[in-house]
From Swiss-Prot:
InterPro entries: HMG_box_dom, HMG_box_dom_sf, Sox7/17/18_central, Sox_C, SRY-related_HMG-box_TF-like. Keywords: Activator, Developmental protein, DNA-binding, Gastrulation, Nucleus, Transcription, Transcription regulation, Wnt signaling pathway. This is Transcription factor Sox-17-alpha-B. Residues 262-376 form the Sox C-terminal domain. It comes from Xenopus laevis. The keyword DNA-binding applies. Residues 58-126 bind DNA. Induction: Involved in multiple regulatory feedback loops with other endodermal factors, including the nodal-related factors/Xnrs. Autoinduces. One of its GO terms (biological process) is heart development.
Length: 377
């Protein structure tokens, strides 16, 4: 019958201990568990091997300082039990240096006797120093690399026990790749600025809807190349009307005006393709006299158009300065207004459906001839 205290402090406890091996005998011993006897035997074997190596290794004979410090170290250790062995060695070295030669003589003689005795006992002895310093350095390096302080562990581990990979400073730097140039080079006029430095072109003003616009904006090189290019997105009938009007104006002008370089009519008619190519399909026949005022959704005009306007202004000033007839000046003024370019405060009046550019040129020419032949008072 078992005791009420559950077997603690009674004989039933021993019976319970004995019954456990009997109950577990059928299961057998686990394969991964090692018996306690093997661990104890391993420790005993390692101690025996270390002792045999120490006994088999021949020690070097003591010098005079070692003979003197053998007894002196014991005496200092008894006087200062709290001092570390390194501190005792420092004190022994200072006191040994402080001794005179007469005081060191008996210890030197004793060290010589021990050396002779050692040579007699071990004639084939050769000093083989133990590389303990290198081993200690390696152990210190391994300990410093493997073991971390609690502060470092808390820095590496998060507050909830998870690993924070950002805290590892492994020496890897993020590699930055250069950004690829944008495919739409026409969207960046600053990158193309060095290409146009030789032409001394003005910088076009940017529009707020340049980025949102899907159609590309073409920035071609000089105006001469642009004059040779053919427009692609305007009405063919409108082109025919302008060409016919230009031919009529050229026929009416004298030969000296046609042969001279930089004729205003030929230059403007030849370079009229630049507004067409710039504005594309948005350039309509009805808006010929108003294209110099673009809407909010249109991009800023190209630099070639601004340069063309400045060249025409200077050319008109030269024409006004020269002594020409009123008939020639009036024809050049009419041709510019019909082409949709306003100069010096000219009012832009849209053409009507009845009067085309040819009829307006003919009517204005007849009026000019009439007033030119009229005798002045």
């Amino acid at each position: 019958m078992s005791s009420p205290d559950g077997g603690y402090g009674s004989d039933d406890q021993n019976q319970g201990k004995c019954s456990v091996p009997i109950m577990m005998s059928g299961l057998g011993q686990c394969q991964w568990s090692e018996p306690m006897t093997s661990l104890g035997e391993g420790k005993l074997k390692s101690d025996a091997n270390s002792r045999s190596k120490a006994e088999g290794r021949i020690r070097r004979p003591m010098n005079a300082f070692m003979v003197w410090a053998k007894d002196e170290r014991k005496r200092l250790a008894q006087q200062n039990p709290d001092l570390h062995n390194a501190e005792l060695s420092k004190m022994l070295g200072k006191s040994w240096k402080a001794l005179s030669l007469a005081e060191k003589r008996p210890f030197v003689e004793e060290a010589e006797r021990l050396r002779v005795q050692h040579m007699q006992d071990h004639p084939n002895y050769k000093y083989r120093p133990r590389r303990r310093k290198q081993v200690k350095r390696m152990k210190r390096a391994e300990n410093g690399f493997m073991h971390m302080t609690e502060a470092q562990e808390s820095a590496v581990m998060g507050t909830d026990g998870r690993m924070c990979l950002e805290n590892f400073n492994l020496g890897f730097h993020e590699q930055t790749y250069p950004q690829l140039p944008q495919a739409s080079h026409y969207r960046e006029p600053q990158a193309m600025a060095p290409h146009y430095d030789g032409y001394s072109l003005p910088t076009p003003e940017s529009s707020p809807l340049d980025l949102a616009e899907a159609d590309p904006v073409f920035f071609t090189s000089p105006a001469q190349d642009e004059c040779q290019m053919m427009p692609y997105s305007y009405n063919s009938s409108y082109t025919h009307q302008h060409n016919s009007g230009a031919s009529m104006l050229v026929r009416q002008m004298p030969q000296t005006e046609q042969i001279g370089e930089g004729s205003p009519v030929e230059g403007m008619m030849a370079c009229q393709s630049s507004p067409h190519m710039y504005y594309g399909q948005m350039y309509l026949p009805g808006s010929t006299r108003h294209h110099q005022h673009p809407q909010a959704g249109q991009p800023s005009p190209p630099p070639e158009a601004q340069q063309l306007g400045r060249a025409d202004q200077t050319q008109q000033a030269d024409m006004m300065a020269e002594d020409r007839t009123e008939f020639e000046q009036y024809l050049s003024y009419v041709s510019k207004s019909d082409l949709g370019m306003n100069y010096h405060g000219q009012e832009s009046v849209g053409p009507t459906a009845d009067n085309g550019p040819i009829s307006s040129v003919l009517s204005d020419a007849t009026t000019a001839v009439y007033y030119c032949n009229y005798p002045s008072a």
